[in-house]
Structures are given as C-alpha cells and as structure tokens.
Amino acid sequence: MQLDPASGWCQGVRVCRSPNFNARPSGEISLLVIHNISLPPAQFATGKVQEFFQNRLDVTEHPYFAGIADLRVSAHFLIERDGTVTQFVSCLERAWHAGVSSFEGRETCNDFSVGIELEGTDDLPFEDAQYQALTTLTRQLQSTFTAITAQRICGHSDIAPGRKTDPGPAFDWARYRAALAKAALEQEEQR
C-alpha cells in the first residue's frame, strides 16, 4: 500500500467512500487514533461496518442497529480480521470518528487526526494480519504526516476517557509499538 500525499488516498487498499466527512480546518495532521468496531457486536466479516459508514445500514436486520440508526460516523480506515484495509475518507479530510475528544489539552481530535478502526471488540484478541496491516498503514501515515510520532498514537479511550473504551484491553500496544519501531529501523537501513 502507498499513501498519495496529494490526495490523501491509499493505493493498494479497498475504497468504500463515506459521505460522513467534511473539510479539515487548517493545521497539521498530528494524531493517529486506534479504534475497534464490529457490527453486530462481536460478529465479523458481515459487511455491516461498511454499510454503517455509508449510511446504508438496514436497521431492521438486528436489534442493536436500532440504537445506532441516527448516527453519522466514519473513520479513515478499517482493518478487517484478515488484514484487508478499506479506506472511507481521504486523510486530508475530517472523518467523524473521535466525537467529543481531547488530546494534550486540544479539543476536537477529528480536526487533526486520522482514525483507524480495527474489526474487533475490547476483549477478543486481534489477529496477526491486523497487526501487520496496522503497522504498514501506520508507517505510511507517519511518512506523509511526520507529526504523527510514536507518542502521538493513541486509543479512542485515551482521547475520550469515560466515554469510550476502544481499542480495549485485548489490543496489544507493546506488540504494535515494537513492530512500528522495527519497521522504522528497517526503513532507515534501506535508505
């Protein structure tokens, strides 16, 4: 996969455009937010996340859907259990993933962040393929948006404490950070 800095779209990933975005205010993209999602909860590979982000979810298909029927949300990316990456919104646009949020005293994280959803739940381990895809995608983002340092990668729970819990305790931050460090070192050695 390759992120095109001019368009904010990744080449080599699935594209499923969401209408749930708007223009970013001026300023640097400097934060990466990791989330998890599954629709219905704890059910995978249903295609319902894609429908949800496109406002096409049939709310009569599952009782859970009635509670989210009026939400208009998106993320820039979704990484499915098998590692498939789908992009919904250009990284240059503001996806609606963070909601009421704050990072280091700065409110409204959607203004300056990229959001990645991992297909999963707080309590089920994520798949090797997801960690691999997340690492590759993160390195692409860091190459384009250099202000997204390791210290500026967080979970939704970090920017919306008490309101959000994802990516949850099943997400292995140490594994992810070690993979990022290794990928960065390998990238430096190739230069």
Residue ranges and their predicted role:
Residues M1-W9, E107, F112, T121-R191:
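Basic/polar, cationic surfaces and motifs that engage anionic cell-wall
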Residues M1-E107:
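N-terminal catalytic cores of peptidoglycan-degrading enzymes
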Residues I34, I116, L134:
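Conserved, mostly hydrophobic/aromatic
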Residues N36-I37, L118, S157:
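Residues immediately flanking
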